[in-house]
Amino acid sequence: MHSNGFFLKDVAGFLGGYYTFIAIMNGVAALILWRRKNQPGWAMVWSIVAGLTMVLAGLALSGSASLVPSLPLSVRMLVNKLSGPVLYTLGTTALFTVLFVFRKFFVKPMVAWTVLNVLLVLMGFSMADENFASIVMKPDNVPIVGLVFMLAFFTWVATSQAVVNDERIAQGLPPMEKLNDEKVLVWPDLVYTELICMVAVSAFLLVWAIVLQAPLEEPASSVKTPNPSKAPWYFLGLQEMLVYFDPWYAGVVLPSMVVFGLMAMPYLDFNKKGNGYYSIEERKFSYLVYQFGFFELWITLIILGTFLRGPNWNFFGPFEYWTPYKVEVLNNVDLPQMFWVNLLDRPLPRAPQGAGMLTQVGTILLREAPGLVLLGAYLVLLPPLLAVTVFRKFFAKMGFVRYMIMANLMLLMLTLPLKMILRWTLNLKYIVSIPEFSLNF
C-alpha cells in the first residue's frame, strides 16, 4: 500500500477529470432547461451545482490530503462497522420496496437527476479512500460500476413510461405507445441507426481497451491460487449462492429452474393486458416477482461478490482493507442436530455397525425426518394452501397445472432468501444433510 499522500497524488488527475465531467453534465442540463424546457429556476440550480463541482475538481487536482474532498474517517469507519451480508440484503430489499412504493415521485426527471448527482458526488468522495478506490477502480470491476448506473437508468426510463401509461389508462386514454404506432422501414432507417450505433460502440470499446490496463493474467498454477478466487462477474451470483447451498442445487438446479421459468412464462401468463406497452398497475404481480428475482436475487449478489467479498470469501466493508488474515467465527449447525441433539437432547440416530442397506436408509430417513417433513410441507402443502387464500384468483384463472408450476417455481426462487435468513438468524447450514450420498439442502 502507498501512503495516503502518495495515493492522493496518483488519483488526483482522475478525480479532477471526474468532477469536471459532473460539472459539464450539469452545465449541459442547465442549458437544455433554460433554452428548450423554459425552466430558468432549475437551470439556475444546476448551474450552481456545476460551479460547485468545478470547485471540487480544483481541490481534487491539488492532491493534498487536506484539500481533496473525502468522507470523514468516522463515517467510513461507521460504514465498515455496519456492513455485513444481513444489512446489505435487508438494505437493498428496503431500497427496492421504497422505490416501488414511491415510484411516481422518483421517476420525476428533476428528482432522478438529483439522486444521480448525489450518488456521483458520494462516489467521488469515496474514491479519495485508498481501499475503496483499489476495488472500484480495478479494471476488471469498472464494467460492474457501469452496470449499476446503466441498470438504474434503463429501469428509470421503463418505470417512468409505465407510470405515464398507468395514469393515462386510469383516465380512459390509450397508452403512449398507441399514439405513435407508425411503422418505420428497415431500410434505410433502422439499418442506418444500427450502423451508427455499431461504429460508436466500436470506437468506445477501442478507447476503453487502450485506457484501461487489463492484460491477461499469468497461466494458472496449482501451487499458486489467487485469494480471493472469484468466478467471472456473471457467475458471481452463483458463487455467492454456494455459501448457502451445495453445488448441485446452487449451480445446477436453481439456474435450470430460472431457464425453465423464463421459457414457461408465456404459457403461464393469463393476463391479456400490458402487452406491447409499459405498465405496472396492469401487471403488478409479474412486475414485482421479476424485479425481485432479477435485482435482489441476481444483480445485488453480483455487486456483493465483486465489491464486498474479499480474501477467503470474507465480507469486507467498502472502506476496509482486504487482509487475508481476517478470521470470522462460524458455528453453523444442521437441522437434524438442532432437532435431535439441541431440542430432544438425544444423539443423532445411527445405524448399527454392519447393518444392511435397508436399515441404513431407514436410519437416514429417521435422522432427516424433520427436514424432509419441512420441505414436504413447503413444496407440497403450501401451494394448495396459497391457492385457497392469497392466490385464489390466480388458481381460478390458471387452472391446476399452470398454477402448480407457477407456485413451485416461485417457492423454489424463495428458497434462496429463506435459506439466507435461516443462516443469519439460526446459524442453520443444512435443512437436510445426507453426507452418505453427498446430498445436502
Model region roles, listed by residue range:
Residues 144-147, 169-180:
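Extended, regular secondary-structure scaffolds
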Residues 13-69, 80-130, 142-165, 188-275, ...:
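Hydrophobic cores of alpha-helical transmembrane segments in multi-pass integral membrane proteins
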Residues 2-7, 73-78, 133-139, 168-173:
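Soluble extramembrane regions of membrane proteins in the secretory/endomembrane system
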Residues 178-183, 235-237:
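Short membrane-interface loop/juxtamembrane segments of multi-pass integral membrane proteins
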